[in-house]
Amino acid sequence: MKAGDLIQYRPDTGGAFLGIITKDPGIHLEYNKVAVEIYWQDDGSYTYEHVEIILDPEKEWLELISESR
């Protein structure tokens, strides 16, 4: 997982939102876990998301859908 990869978020309310990882994985000081920064195209916001959640196949609401080269 690295900058440029595409993330999809599917909330319980339906729909899907696409985000682009803007920073490679690193320790996020607030969470004290490995996280990536994501730019969400629908509203122009940035969030940090835990890498372990994105890669967990049981967490279907947030997933890596395309890896950049």
Predicted features by range, described:
Residues 1-12, 20:
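Short coil-to-beta transition motif at edge beta-strands of beta-rich domains
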Residues 2-3, 30-35:
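A short, compositionally biased
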Residues 7, 21, 34-38:
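Hydrophobic aliphatic residue packing
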Residues 7, 18, 48-50:
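Short linear proline/tyrosine/threonine-rich motifs used for host-factor recruitment
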Residues 12-14, 43:
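Glycine-centered tight beta-turn/hairpin loop motif at sheet-sheet or coil-to-beta transitions
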Residues 15-28:
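Short beta-strand-centered aromatic/proline hotspots
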Residues 33, 38-69:
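Intrinsically disordered, low-complexity, charged/polar segments
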